[in-house]
Design a protein with these regions (language model features):
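A short helix-loop-beta-strand connector motif used in the catalytic cores of GNAT acetyltransferases and
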Residues: 59-71
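Acyl-donor (CoA/ACP) binding surface of acyl/acetyltransferases
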Residues: 1-42, 69-156
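Conserved GNAT-fold acetyl-CoA-binding loop/helix
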Residues: 39-60
Length: 156
């Protein structure tokens, strides 16, 4: 079974406090709330000033090719609070990079560490990846802490 079939099998999965699913266009309001706040995506992409920009970003970057991209949802609040995805997934070399972001009102509560740890485990156990990495901005110490708490080693 190839990695794309395995990713399709894991379109939906969960942890203790979170569930992961493909993005829906109905996420646009939650996505815009997240993407229009410059603190949330400071190291990722420019702030989405208008709802139309958020609609475009959601459709083109998160929905167009959904395998390996998940909306992170809070089970209790039943809303989308972030995203986690594979960047540069190489099916032949069996390696990938993980990218992620989270609403700032969910920061420092272990949510992203929970999300990254789960995807790390799935990557090795189910998707049979041999190498996984997280590339962070040099000044993004919060993301570096998430990576380290999730078992990744910091290289500079």
């Amino acid at each position: 079974m190839n990695i794309w079939t395995k990713l399709a099998m894991y379109s939906f999965y969960e942890t203790e406090r979170l569930y992961f699913r493909p993005f829906f266009f109905t996420d646009v309001d939650d996505f815009h709330a997240l993407a229009s706040d410059p603190e949330n995506l400071q190291f990722i992409f420019p702030t989405q000033a208008s709802i139309e920009e958020s609609q475009y970003a959601l459709a083109n970057y998160f929905m167009k090719s959904p395998l390996g991209i998940w909306a992170i949802c809070d089970k209790k609040a039943q809303k989308m609070i972030g995203a986690i995805k594979f960047e540069k997934l190489d099916e032949i070399r069996k390696e990938a990079e993980i990218g992620y972001f989270l609403r700032k009102d969910y920061w420092s509560q272990g949510y992203m560490t929970e999300a990254v740890t789960k995807l790390r485990d799935l990557s090795m156990d189910q998707f049979e990846l041999k190498q996984l990495s997280i590339v962070t901005h040099l000044e993004n110490s919060a993301s570096q802490k998430v990576a380290q708490k999730s078992g990744f080693v910091l290289y500079r």
